């Protein structure tokens, strides 16, 4: 298994510097990861540095709480794409989902999907650690209905990350034609392989190099 091509090499911490981002970009070139996943402020730099390389530029929308307005998320998406993003990972309105406001949740996702249409993949972060199994299923169903390309477990900034059980539930819910991304707490090759075996088609990790080299040392971040 070419595990590197399933990994979004991720750096999303608030104190990320340009030097940190450049390191992630160089590692992505070297190990040929699927993408680099960075905050929107770094998209232009990443797009310039990765031009001509088979590495996508992924950024985050409404991150990490998902509580910004739909209009803000749609604008963020358009702006990120204009600066070179080819994938966007958006956070759902978790509170609205828990309130049972399916219409708001679906519209929120739909507007981001429309803003990205034909230009970028949309991955929908449902923040599994805050949801019941019924809510996880509903979030996945609404994501598919709204036209998302992927569903994703976690931001890595909440109370928990990906589990094989959640990945299996999400895969069962979305079927074979929508991607499932495991993120949050995937630190070793064994972790990553477990997620793929459960149904993940992409893995988000900051410990990507350690995963590829099968080196458990140096894999310390939550994401």
Curated annotation (Swiss-Prot):
Active site: residue positions: 89, 152, 181
Pathway: Carbohydrate degradation; 2-deoxy-D-ribose 1-phosphate degradation; D-glyceraldehyde 3-phosphate and acetaldehyde from 2-deoxy-alpha-D-ribose 1-phosphate: step 2/2
Cellular component, GO annotation: cytoplasm
Cellular location(s): Cytoplasm
GO function terms (MF aspect): deoxyribose-phosphate aldolase activity
Key words of the record: Cytoplasm, Lyase, Schiff base
Lineage top rank: taxon: Bacteria
CDD domains from the UniProt entry: DeoC
Catalytic activity from the UniProt record: 2-deoxy-D-ribose 5-phosphate = D-glyceraldehyde 3-phosphate + acetaldehyde
Pfam families linked: DeoC
Major subcellular site: cytoplasm
SMART domains assigned to the protein according to its UniProt record, in alphabetical order: DeoC
Task of the protein: Catalyzes a reversible aldol reaction between acetaldehyde and D-glyceraldehyde 3-phosphate to generate 2-deoxy-D-ribose 5-phosphate.
Name recorded for this polypeptide: Deoxyribose-phosphate aldolase
């Amino acid at each position: 298994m070419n595990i590197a091509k399933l990994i979004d090499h991720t750096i999303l911490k608030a104190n990320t510097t340009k030097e940190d981002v450049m390191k992630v970009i160089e590692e992505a070139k070297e190990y040929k990861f699927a993408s680099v996943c960075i905050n929107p402020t770094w998209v232009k730099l990443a797009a310039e540095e990765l031009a001509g390389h088979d590495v996508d530029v992924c950024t985050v929308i409404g991150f990490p709480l998902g509580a910004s307005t739909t209009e803000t998320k749609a604008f963020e998406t358009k702006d990120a794409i204009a600066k070179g993003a080819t994938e966007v990972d958006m956070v759902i309105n978790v509170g609205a989902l828990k309130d049972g406001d399916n219409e708001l949740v679906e519209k929120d996702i739909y507007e981001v999907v429309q803003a990205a249409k034909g230009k970028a993949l949309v991955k929908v972060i449902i923040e599994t650690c805050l949801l019941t199994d019924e809510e996880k299923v509903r979030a996945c169903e609404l994501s598919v209905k709204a036209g998302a390309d992927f569903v994703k477990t976690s931001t890595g900034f909440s109370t928990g990350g990906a589990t094989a059980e959640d990945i299996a539930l999400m895969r069962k819910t979305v079927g074979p034609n929508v991607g499932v991304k495991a993120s949050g707490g995937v630190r070793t090759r064994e972790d990553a392989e477990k997620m793929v075996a459960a149904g993940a088609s992409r893995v988000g990790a900051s410990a990507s190099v350690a995963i590829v080299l099968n080196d458990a040392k140096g894999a310390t971040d939550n994401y």
